[in-house]
Swiss-Prot record:
InterPro entries attached to this UniProt entry: Enolpyruvate_Tfrase_dom (IPR001986), Enolpyruvate_Tfrase_sf (IPR036968), EPSP_synthase (IPR006264), EPSP_synthase_CS (IPR023193), RNA3'P_cycl/enolpyr_Trfase_a/b (IPR013792)
Localization per record: Cytoplasm
Example of a GO MF term: 3-phosphoshikimate 1-carboxyvinyltransferase activity
Species, as recorded: Novosphingobium aromaticivorans (strain ATCC 700278 / DSM 12444 / CCUG 56034 / CIP 105152 / NBRC 16084 / F199)
The name this protein goes by in its record: 3-phosphoshikimate 1-carboxyvinyltransferase
Biochemical pathway: Metabolic intermediate biosynthesis; chorismate biosynthesis; chorismate from D-erythrose 4-phosphate and phosphoenolpyruvate: step 6/7
Oligomer and partners: Monomer.
A Pfam family that the UniProt record links to this protein: EPSP_synthase
Biological process (GO), any one: aromatic amino acid family biosynthetic process
Binding site for phosphoenolpyruvate: K22, G95, R123, Q170, R352, R400
Highest taxon of source: Bacteria
Amino acid sequence: MRPRRFTANGPLKGRIGVPGDKSISHRSIMLGALAVGETRVTGLLEGEDVLSTAAAMRAMGATIERDADGMWHVHGVGVGGLLQPQQALDMGNSGTSTRLLMGLVATHPITATFVGDASLSKRPMGRVIDPLSTMGAEFTASPGGRLPLTLRGISPAVPIEYRLPVASAQVKSAVLLAGLNTPGVTTVIEPIPTRDHSERMLRGFGAELTVDVAADGARVIRVRGEAELKPQDIAVPGDPSSAAFFVVAALLVEGSDLVVENVGLNPTRAALFDVLRLMGGSIEELNRREVGGEPVADLRVRHSLLTGIDVDPAVVPSMVDEFPVLFVAAALAKGRTVTTGLEELRVKESDRISAMRAALELAGATVTETEDGLIIDGTGGDPLPGTAEGASVVTHLDHRIAMSMAIAGIASRNGVEVDDTRPIATSFPVFESLLESATRP
């Protein structure tokens, strides 16, 4: 355990950059490893989750190296060229690595065992096992479809048409990646749109992929298999999920005026910023541009008094990871914020609904937990009291709980004690040092 008390340290000023987008980092390594030739990646997020993906692709034959300037070089094996790994693939804490790599392995004639840490081993994999089994892959999983899990891939696999029963970019991506080495056309039908990095990047690497909208509004995504992917040069934009912590911090701490540079604003990911604007947050987009098919801008954020709202459940897929820090913003808003439709948060790295209710209550917020969300009565802009001496927030090995409550701490009177800051390294290794530099006078 590495506990830490986060305390008010003055306004956030100046300009900061956040690390590369986690979703794009994972996919650039995976698709680079399936292309023929060298893919070069700058701005890669070097957190533990992405490094788990890189280690797994190395174990299956790709050559992946980082040079002294921080550029990553990926020499791929070609679609269909993945090799049998010699030992279990350790996914650490990364649900994304696990589910997407299961898709890749499922349609190669290899067998792989996936293992993970205590938190990942509690997360259900059944939603990925179901469609991949239909394609012909075989699974031996721990009870409840959990890790450790052994997957026996099949080639040639059977192309399927799969309608997602629950909005999940990871399940969608797993099936599309499985489709790359499957003869014919693999189809995913998505009733509610989720983040579309996989579609954008598959096209960018040269896969034949189409997206149509059905009569009922569902997205119909088709990928033609036995593709030949071409290597790419990728500049990874800053991660909006990481930027979220600093955007909320600057809104809450009086006197703040902060620019967060190079933030990816993919519309399937950036709903938090729209919700915060609806609450009265001053968030301005400067220097809007497009990098590698992804919209990017610098965000200028100024301290604002937020007002509570009813958050439309339709935005959930576009900000599913940002709710913990939105709860912190709501705790200091004027009036009541109501969130619904958040069942998915109960099966993240922790049960984020109950974990954040307990954490915010400990810090002095007024919170009611419901089946599918939280109802938060804000302080009207006053700082939270903070946690009492000897009391610390339980993060449940969840990086987003730890970082959200760190932000609550810098917007509190007495500070917030977080029981363990180590999980932060999974997605944002420089979070604490960046927070210190933003609040340094």
